């Protein structure tokens, strides 16, 4: 029998996208999953839409927060409820290809791995394909990941029996990158499924679309997560920016 995959989905005011996101999970060829949605006190119809799905599909589970506490809290809340052998992440506005989970679980088992991710394609806020494919080094070393988050959150899967549930402080930004750093520091290198298995949605109001916020949050990874002093963190950020501007674009291609 196939092992259970727990899909972690934090939500907040995503009524425009959540229906398609849930449907992309329901369309998976790998069917042994639970989708754990932790809502961070949405003020729109997000909760009502999720409840509509949950009433018809017992694999979809909703947990509601009474107050808005941030994406990190919602993600941790969902993770605490997870019961699967594997943990997968998906944001409430992104989409999976139908064979995403099946290909990744098979890849993990065939190669005796405990963590993997994949390439992904990009769409705009309205769902139009931007013909922009994001790839990564293969294999991906800890040093490469240290200077650039090559792992798309919507593509990552790890073995919770091996690593345990990786729960980080909710106040920390770039929580996803910190999780991958924690994992790859332990296993030394990571291997992606070398094909796109998801659509990443680029929204006008997303954190990922704000370069200034990203620089600030990425600096926090070196300063707070790794614990480096101010001067060394600045030097690391210079190397990080070099990687972002010069090296990473080589892995962004037309789809």
Language model features with spans:
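Conserved donor NDP-sugar-binding/catalytic core segment of glycosyltransferases
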Residues: 99-130
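Short aromatic/hydrophobic "clamp" motif used to bind/position activated sugar donors
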Residues: 87
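Cell-envelope/extracellular polymer assembly enzymes that use nucleotide-activated donors
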Residues: 3-6, 24, 34, 178
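Conserved nucleotide-sugar donor-binding catalytic segment
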Residues: 80, 132-217, 221
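Acidic helix N-cap motif at the loop->helix transition within catalytic regions
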Residues: 16-19, 44-52, 95, 99
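Glycine-rich, basic loop-to-helix element that forms the pyrophosphate-binding segment
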Residues: 65-82, 103
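Short, well-formed alpha-helical segments that are part of the catalytic scaffolds
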Residues: 13-27
